[in-house]
């Protein structure tokens, strides 16, 4: 009786994955730096593989705790929501830094960019071509993920799965269009401030889209296994929050960099 749980909190068991993922991120960061400076890519790909494996194992344990061990009580879910809110807030500040850098150099161009913005040797993208299509794709994906959420709340499992499926497809389509745009760009990320800021801002957003697509794909796989109910679905709710955040960031990127900046 002394070991009986008398509270609603989850005292997590020791896990190797936090420290493993931390070191994997270090390998990924160092590998990326070497790739940018020396065009040596194996370290970056090794770090990425290590991070993906660690994330898979870590989230697998979290799913087991939630679905099979019953550790995610209503009190625990409240704190999960607090945590996700703080995480998204930190991501907002991350993008604020890149918007700040962009507007600082574009509103006050110096001699390094020829005192004009965009620089004269830069051929900007037509905002009403692929960028507009990507905007419509993400707006539509925001609608489909909301449809999935409402279907789950109404216990419509079929609508939930259909909405998630469409959202994942749209996220993948956005990434393909972004890759196509990068491939046909007339400038790269090195050599001038325009390319650096453009690729860091839109590239990190693209990375977030990939992460969000994987997040939602995992939710889709879990949904097909019968996971998530209208009263217990924070895993999907967190993915939906993250996806809406990605949508909003893209609207600002589209307006600031593609439309105004062109």
Residue locations for each model-derived region?
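...captures the hydrophobic TM-helix bundle architecture rather than a specific catalytic motif
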Residues: 1-262
């Amino acid at each position: 009786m002394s070991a009986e749980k008398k509270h609603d909190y989850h005292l997590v068991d020791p896990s190797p994955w936090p420290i493993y993922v931390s070191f994997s991120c270090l390998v990924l960061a160092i590998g990326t730096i070497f790739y940018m400076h020396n065009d040596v890519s194996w370290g970056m790909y090794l770090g990425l593989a290590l991070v993906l494996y660690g994330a898979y194992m870590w989230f697998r344990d979290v799913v087991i705790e939630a679905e099979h061990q019953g550790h995610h009580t209503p009190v625990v879910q409240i704190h999960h929501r607090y945590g996700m809110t703080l995480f998204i807030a930190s991501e907002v500040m991350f993008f604020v830094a890149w918007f700040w850098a962009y507007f600082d150099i574009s509103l006050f161009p110096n001699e390094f960019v020829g005192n004009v913005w965009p620089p004269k040797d830069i051929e900007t993208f037509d905002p009403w071509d692929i960028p507009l299509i990507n905007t419509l794709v993400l707006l539509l994906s925001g609608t489909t993920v909301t449809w999935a959420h409402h279907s789950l709340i109404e216990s419509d499992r079929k609508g939930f799965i259909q909405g998630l499926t469409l959202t994942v497809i749209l996220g993948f389509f956005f990434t393909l269009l972004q890759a196509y745009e990068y491939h046909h760009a007339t400038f790269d990320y090195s050599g001038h401030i325009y390319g650096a800021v453009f690729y860091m801002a839109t590239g990190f957003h693209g990375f977030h889209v990939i992460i969000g697509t994987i997040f939602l794909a995992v939710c889709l796989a879990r949904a097909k296994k019968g996971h998530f109910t209208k009263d217990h679905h924070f895993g999907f709710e967190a993915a939906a929050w993250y996806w809406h955040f990605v949508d909003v960031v893209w609207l600002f990127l589209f307006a600031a960099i593609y439309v105004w900046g062109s």
